[in-house]
Amino acid sequence: MLFRSVITQNVDNLHERAGSTSVLHLHGELTKARSELYQDIIVPMPNQGLQPDSRCEKGSLLRPHIVWFGETVPFMSTAQNYMAHADICIVIGTSLQVYPAAGLLNHLKPQIPVWVIDPHLPQSNLPMGYQWIQSKAAEGMGKLREQLLSDAYIHFK
């Protein structure tokens, strides 16, 4: 079974707008609201935004579906599971300084290939054997694509 997923700390919906269909938003989503009492109740953000008295169907107040500083990241165990079962890992545009997300690389199996795409090499949390592509995201993804296609060609030649 081939499983592809994006784990992001971004709260926008740019991954979905770019066509990604399996996106785990660690820090929530600006386009959604959730119940203050029932974390499993997540609804689209009303067009007019949340009003001070906006409530879910169970009557509790709604709030932005965002993880504020100091709050627990609700999907952390799911993200750890994704990492534990990954065949490859591509880290794009992060300093790897924000926890607990920065610790996700610790859940990879030791032999998993890891690429880091960023103009500046993160100073910590890099697994052994990682490959660094010193570029911004779009350019770096192009370089990674070329590298993978070249490696596949050499492997199957």
Task: Please provide the spans of the model-predicted regions.
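Conserved catalytic alpha/beta core of Sir2/sirtuin-type deacylases, generalized to analogous enzyme cores
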Residues: M1-K157
